[in-house]
Structures are given as structure tokens and as C-alpha cells.
A protein has these predicted regions:
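An N-terminal, well-structured beta->alpha segment
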Residues: 49-94
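Gly/Ser/Thr-rich loops at beta-strand to alpha-helix junctions
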Residues: 104-112, 149, 176-180
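A structural signal for small-residue-enriched, beta-sheet-centric alpha/beta enzyme cores
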Residues: 143-144, 173-295
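Short glycine-rich or small-residue beta-strand-to-loop segments that form or flank ligand, phosphate
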Residues: 63-67, 98-109, 142-146
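N-terminal amphipathic/basic leader segments beginning at the initiator methionine
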Residues: 1-58
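Conserved active-site and cofactor/substrate-binding residues in soluble primary-metabolism enzymes
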Residues: 59, 75, 79, 83, ...
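A structural-propensity feature for long, helix-poor, extended segments
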Residues: 135-163, 167
Length: 295
């Protein structure tokens, strides 16, 4: 049986709804609104049955389509950062006073570098809280654990030890994802309160990061940067009205990843959007103040 591969809950829901010819699935609440210049789709998986169908843990997934903002180059950084920050703040709630931000992925492989690059733009304040000028700030620490092939240590193991030492209220993990559609690459951001499996975007699944493994809530920020070749082929054929595809013709293509040719520039820009979005969600700063602090 041919299957699309996607890490986006919104896409998984769309695919199953199309297959069953339904508006939504039992056990799933989904709605799309337009705010702050972009469409925001919220998918809440309420039951274990729905979670199994979608292949995603129970919880809330919020997907922002930033493509309308990216067409206006004048203030795209500010508007996109504000949009991400507002949705993340709503997801976190009011009780998170200290956060560990984890930039997951391989900084040396561009499509997988969104986590480490975003972490560079997060305002670190844990060591400044004793200073009266920063007493109202959220305590934020940052870690980029690298990948198993570089360190010999699972990201989960590194983060679990750090969580025990730092004792944050929550972890925010940033990582690359896979999409079913080229149109969503580097233009979509998924936020969730369900944790994340590092490396899923590039097909290298590692130990999951979740409340069960780290002991604190784990919020995930994911950006689709790749499409696997088999999924891309299925998507293109579907658009062309071809549904009778021989599964044998696609065998072996699941290990081939496709990304955009300007991925370096895309990651560089999106990393600032994600990093600044986290800062705006956590700190009592407006965008101009944040830019002054971050240089």
C-alpha cells in the first residue's frame, strides 16, 4: 500500500479525511482561522483511536502558514516572529516561568540545521535573573545537543541530565520536519504540546522527547525542510490525476530526500523567525526592543 510521509498533523488529517470523504475524523477537532496575516490551523487529537489513525500522539498541533507574510519582504521578520510568538504563548499558558530551549539537529547538514540555527537567536536569561533589570524576565537557557553520530550521546540523554540540573518548567524543542508537499517547505511552522522525536524530518528517528522521558512538558516547534522522493512523486501524480501507481516503482525512494535549492537562505531567515518568536512569547519585550538586545 502506498503511503504519504508527513510529520505535519494537519497534512495527516487532510489525507485521512480525503480518503474517508469526511470533513473531520472522529476524535479530532480541527479548525482554520486567519489572524496576524497568516492562516492558523489547529488540530486537537482527543482519543487514542484518532492518534493511531494519524500516527501522532494525543494533544494539540498548531500550524502556521507564513507564505502570505513572506511575500511582503519589508516587514516579514517582524510579522512572522509576532505570529509565531503569539501562538506559542497561547500554547504555553501562563504558568511557565523557566524554559530550556533545545536546538535539535545537525548544524552541518543544512536541511537539518533549523534547530541549532534558531537557538542562536534565543535570548538567554537564566544567568541574568539575579540582576534587577531582568527580574521580570522568563528564565531561559539554551542547549544544542548535536546528533548521535557527532557526540555518541542521544539528545534525550543529554537533555534529561540538563533538565535535572536546570529544573525548567518546560522544554521547547526545535527540529526539522518532513512535509508531503513542496509548497509547505520553509513556509510552514508547526507548534505542538506533545513532544517530538528528534531526526524525524530527515528519516533518522531517535529517542522521543516528551514528559515521560524528560519529566517536564515538552513543546515542539517544527519546520518542514524536506519531502521524501516517494511522497513527492505520489503528490505530483495525484495533482495530475494519476492514482493507479505501481508500488514497486517507488520502492527504495523513501531514503531520498528533496529540499529547495535556496535552503541555505531559507534556513537562515526562518531561524531568526523561530528564535525571535520564542523570545517574544517568553519575554516582556516588543520587537524593536528585542532587535536592540539581539543586535
Amino acid at each position: 500500500m502506498l503511503q504519504y510521509r508527513t510529520d505535519l498533523a494537519m497534512e495527516a488529517h487532510e489525507l485521512l479525511c480525503a480518503k474517508s470523504r469526511a470533513q473531520t475524523l472522529s476524535g479530532v477537532d480541527s479548525r482554520t482561522v486567519f489572524r496576524r496575516g497568516c492562516s492558523v490551523t489547529s488540530v486537537r487529537i482527543n482519543t487514542e483511536g484518532a492518534a493511531r489513525q494519524l500516527g501522532k500522539p494525543r494533544g494539540r498541533y498548531v500550524t502556521l502558514d507564513l507564505s502570505p507574510l513572506q511575500k511582503n519582504a519589508d516587514d516579514v521578520l517582524e510579522r512572522a516572529s509576532r505570529a509565531v510568538g503569539a501562538e506559542l504563548r497561547a500554547l504555553l499558558g501562563e504558568n511557565v516561568k523557566s524554559v530550556l530551549v533545545a536546538g535539535l539537529g545537525n548544524a552541518n547538514m543544512t536541511p537539518d540545521a533549523i534547530g541549532p540555527r534558531s537557538a542562536e537567536h534565543v535570548l538567554v536569561t537564566r544567568h541574568l535573573r539575579q540582576n534587577g533589570a531582568f527580574s521580570a524576565f522568563c528564565s531561559v537557557s539554551v542547549l544544542t545537543p548535536g546528533v548521535l553520530g557527532q557526540t555518541g550521546i542521544e539528545a534525550m540523554e543529554t537533555l534529561r541530565g540538563t533538565v535535572r540540573a536546570v529544573q525548567p518548567d518546560a522544554v521547547i524543542a526545535i527540529d526539522a520536519l518532513a512535509s508531503r508537499s513542496l509548497m509547505r517547505l520553509c513556509s510552514t511552522v508547526q507548534l505542538s504540546d506533545t513532544g517530538i522525536v528528534p531526526g524525524s524530518g530527515v528519516g533518522n528517528h531517535r529517542c522521543p522527547l516528551s514528559r515521560d522521558t524528560l519529566g517536564v512538558p515538552v513543546y515542539a516547534i517544527g519546520v518542514p525542510t524536506v519531502v521524501d522522493a516517494a511522497t513527492l512523486t505520489l503528490d505530483v501524480l495525484e495533482e495530475a490525476g494519476k492514482s493507479d501507481v505501481d508500488p514497486a516503482a517507488l520502492r527504495g525512494h523513501e531514503t531520498v530526500m528533496v529540499t529547495t535549492r535556496d535552503i541555505d537562505a531559507q534556513i537562515r531567515e526562518l531561524a531568526r523567525v523561530i528564535g525571535y518568536g520564542i523570545d517574544l512569547a517568553l519575554q516582556p519585550l516588543d520587537f524593536s526592543e528585542l532587535c536592540a538586545l539581539m543586535g
